[in-house]
Amino acid sequence: MSEGEPKNTHFGYKTVEADKKADLVADVFHSVAAKYDIMNDVMSFGVHRFWKRHTIEVAAARPGMKVLDLAGGTGDLTAKFSHLVGDRGQVVLADINDSMLKVGRTKLRDKGIVNNVSYVQANAEALPFPDNHFDIITIAFGLRNVTDKDAALRSMQRVLKPGGKLLVLEFSTPKHELMRKVYDMYSFKVLPKMGALITKDADSYEYLAESIRMHPDQETLKQMMVDAGFEQVDYTNMTDGVVALHRGYKF
């Protein structure tokens, strides 16, 4: 690529100019925001709740801590963290998509979760928070939609306190060939049809399936976290590696 030419990236399987991907991803989540929680339950058969519960357990949030739930969407993790950090703590639900934030804010307020939660529309690649600010950062099913994942990881490392931890919960690469074949069939044949039926939007769920395949595998993401400055990076596979939880610390 010669100097001055636009940089390209992937949007699912499509190649697009890097500076246009965020808008394309935004369109997807504007479209699915209202039915996002329903689709999570349907397309994962409810298993996403187990994945998130395990993430909360590994996070080990305590009273008084500051937690950033990045790409927090409709607030599943934020709701749990709010109870754990208590009145002396703080949870920031941050998402680049205002439609998702609105759904999350309404959902949490309907549950009476108001006192220790704030909402910020933010780009993960340039987080608008001070250095060394959060004890815990989580990003669940969001990193694969970020244009510059390396920049986002560096930004998270910057705003994390020394001694703090980052948890990345994301779809990944199944360990066994049979699971990979079943998963591919489900993702590309069944998932878009579910999206069409429930949200009237098959294309968005086709993108989501493609974005999973384009996301770095477990070992690649582990190295990306190390390169961003995280230490003691490890990961746990769940559901045969359909999902992986990566953990890294800042010292």
Swiss-Prot record:
SUPFAM superfamilies (alphabetical): S-adenosyl-L-methionine-dependent methyltransferases
Enzyme Commission number: 2.1.1.163, 2.1.1.201
Pathway: Quinol/quinone metabolism; menaquinone biosynthesis; menaquinol from 1,4-dihydroxy-2-naphthoate: step 2/2; Cofactor biosynthesis; ubiquinone biosynthesis
CDD domains, per database record: AdoMet_MTases (cd02440)
This protein's record includes keyword Metal-binding: no
Binding site for S-adenosyl-L-methionine: 74, 95, 123-124
Keywords attached to this entry: Menaquinone biosynthesis, Methyltransferase, S-adenosyl-L-methionine, Transferase, Ubiquinone biosynthesis
Keyword S-adenosyl-L-methionine appears in the UniProt entry: yes
Domain of life: Bacteria
Enzyme class: transferase
Single biological process term from Gene Ontology: aerobic respiration
Recorded catalytic activity of this chain's protein: a 2-demethylmenaquinol + S-adenosyl-L-methionine = a menaquinol + S-adenosyl-L-homocysteine + H(+); a 2-methoxy-6-(all-trans-polyprenyl)benzene-1,4-diol + S-adenosyl-L-methionine = a 5-methoxy-2-methyl-3-(all-trans-polyprenyl)benzene-1,4-diol + S-adenosyl-L-homocysteine + H(+)
One Pfam family hit: Ubie_methyltran
GO molecular function: 2-methoxy-6-polyprenyl-1,4-benzoquinol methyltransferase activity; demethylmenaquinone methyltransferase activity
UniProt cross-references to InterPro entries, sorted A to Z: SAM-dependent_MTases_sf, UbiE/COQ5_MeTrFase, UbiE/COQ5_MeTrFase_CS
Primary role: Methyltransferase required for the conversion of demethylmenaquinol (DMKH2) to menaquinol (MKH2) and the conversion of 2-polyprenyl-6-methoxy-1,4-benzoquinol (DDMQH2) to 2-polyprenyl-3-methyl-6-methoxy-1,4-benzoquinol (DMQH2).
Family named by the database record: Belongs to the class I-like SAM-binding methyltransferase superfamily. MenG/UbiE family.
Name of this chain's protein: Ubiquinone/menaquinone biosynthesis C-methyltransferase UbiE
Organism the protein comes from: Shewanella frigidimarina (strain NCIMB 400)
